[in-house]
Amino acid sequence: MNTRTMLLSLALTLMALPLASAASPGTFEGSGDTMSALQRGTYMSFVGIGLAFVATAFFLFMERNDVHRDLRPALGVGVMIVGIAGFQYNLMAESYLFDGSIPTDFRYADWFSTVPLMALCFPLVAGRKAYTSKRLFDLPGMSVPGLIMIGAFFMIASGYLGQVELDAAIKAGTDPASIHWYWFAQGMLGYLGVIVIAGTPFTGAYGLDDTKVTDPSLRTALSRMRKLILVGWLIYPVGYVLGAMGSGVEEMVLAYNLADLVNKVGFVIIVWHGVRNAESSRALAHDMEAGFHTLAHAEDKQDDAPSDDLLAIAAMSRGETVEEPEDDL
């Protein structure tokens, strides 16, 4: 067992002890009412998913120094995503345990922080060279990172306004005012904005040019990230509609919790896998290029420059496009 594994195991053990003791009550602390099986499962989903977030954050933090410095910001943002979510889920668990109410404020505090960071991962993984020259109204800050974060903020802010209306109606036992559907639709427009800027697996992106991403591992990661937000983010409106149609607090909360687990942990693992494979490709390309230079030097000690063929092979190993030489004939 290496040092990293030992530290991670120790940290998770120390965190699991208070979580286990906190999970023991079968009643709500505020009212003393006994939890139903569904309520118990809802509470345990907060505890278990929160622990999964914290464990993922530790794992990514330990992996951060093993990737190229150009790709570390993407992994660092991944640590922030699951780290913030783990902290907020602890607060949500405590809030739900008190009286079984919907922890909307804590949840949206999480989303206001983590969803724009998830959107920011797209330009970080693609790299600055992949940014397009498109801007919005030629205003400062309206480059690709700015646009994609504004779209995410717009989506979450609209969703919060709708959720507040919905929560008030659920608490009062009345039908929600129709205005909440307006906020819901506006939030979906923000979601579509993020999709347009970041791209989909089937269409190009407004703000990113994948042809300028030379590493195939990073292109694959971008495609998988797009698939995840295209499908995974749709779980959130499903949870919202469940609450609006009167299915119950727990059903809505469980849908949100499942969506967070799939989208946050799955998303950062895709980012980690892509940047680690890219680092392996860079290391292999470096070793191959060094070997080619050594071979060329051994073949012709009088000419230190390697042949064009060897340089072309080295460039191809890095994922770069090599132009065919023109025929002299």
Which ranges hold each PLM region?
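Hydrophobic transmembrane alpha-helical segments in integral membrane proteins
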Residues: S24-F53
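Alpha-helical transmembrane segments in multipass membrane proteins, preferentially the mid-helix core
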Residues: V54-L60, C121, A157-S158, G190-P216, ...
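N-terminal secretory/membrane targeting signals
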Residues: M1-A23
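C-terminal transmembrane-bundle signature of multipass membrane proteins
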Residues: V196-G204, S223-T321
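Membrane-helix boundary/juxtamembrane motif in polytopic membrane proteins
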Residues: P176-G187, F202-V231
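A generic, lipid-embedded transmembrane alpha helix
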Residues: G76-S95
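Extracellular-loop-to-transmembrane junctions of the mid-late helices
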Residues: M44-V47, D167-P201
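Internal transmembrane alpha-helix with an interfacial aromatic "cap," most often the third helix
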Residues: A57-E63, Y89-D99, Y108-I148, F153-D167
